[in-house]
Amino acid sequence: MQIIRTIKELENFVQNASGKIGFVPTMGALHDGHVSLIKKCVSENETSIVSTFVNPTQFLPGEDLDKYPRKEQSDIQICEQNGVSAIFIPDANELYFEDEPLIVAPKKLSTILEGKTRPGHFDGVLRVLNKLFRLTRANSVYMGKKDTQQLIIVQNMIKTFFLNIELVACDIVREPDGLALSSRNVYICDEDKCNALRLSRSLNKALNLIQNGEEDASEIKANMLEVLEPLKVDYVAVTDRNLNEISKVEKGNTIILVAAYVGKTRLIDNIWI
């Protein structure tokens, strides 16, 4: 496996790569959720690239950029163990320039849910991914459904800029108790763990209601909020696959999303119905 830190090295690697190129963009601190993406990427492509870059442009002032977990040696080891062809570990100065043209996320998609709480976040996400997609010349990109809004906005960018990329949406990986895996889970102390489980339990409550015939979105959200007490809830939403709020669940075209604070840590989760 090659360890790549500069754009020049990456360009040389890609130029000499054989077959289809699969790409897994991450911010490092790799966990089993990332590993599931990596394994799928490696199994479906002759060449696989993983990036581990804590992207400063997607963090808002006062967010956790400085304390976001960084585990470079562990990330390298995980990629090696799973057969990755190359890991790209750039510095911010390698990717960003002064006065460069910016990509702005579509207003409708980027100002709801996560975007309402984190204005400008998705602009930063698209800014770095547009660069990484072009640098890696990826045929397929693997991203998780945990960041559903990001997934949908990235698909929109791929379509808008006519990028010849297949975006592969991969299922959420959970701990045995149901907690969705996230690099930010390291912030959760033991006494807060039970409260963190309220997110997945609220989604399970919604799923059980739907399986028993409930279709009314308001009723589903009310039941979820009961499970989420006493957390500080950012949002509970029932939407279609384009993130439009809906009043009635339609199986095969519904996403239920939740965001809440556990202590000072903000967690997100969702299920696709």
From Swiss-Prot:
Positions annotated as active site in the UniProt record: H34 (proton donor)
MF terms in GO: ATP binding; pantoate-beta-alanine ligase activity
Ranges in coiled-coil conformation: none
Keyword check for Cytoplasm: yes
Gene3D superfamilies from the UniProt entry: HUPs, Pantoate-beta-alanine ligase, C-terminal domain
Subcellular location: Cytoplasm
Domain of life: Bacteria
Pathway(s) served: Cofactor biosynthesis; (R)-pantothenate biosynthesis; (R)-pantothenate from (R)-pantoate and beta-alanine: step 1/1
EC number(s) recorded for this UniProt protein: 6.3.2.1
Assembly and interaction partners: Homodimer.
Name of the featured protein: Pantothenate synthetase
Source species: Campylobacter concisus (strain 13826)
Lineage: Bacteria, Pseudomonadati, Campylobacterota, Epsilonproteobacteria, Campylobacterales
Gene (name only): panC
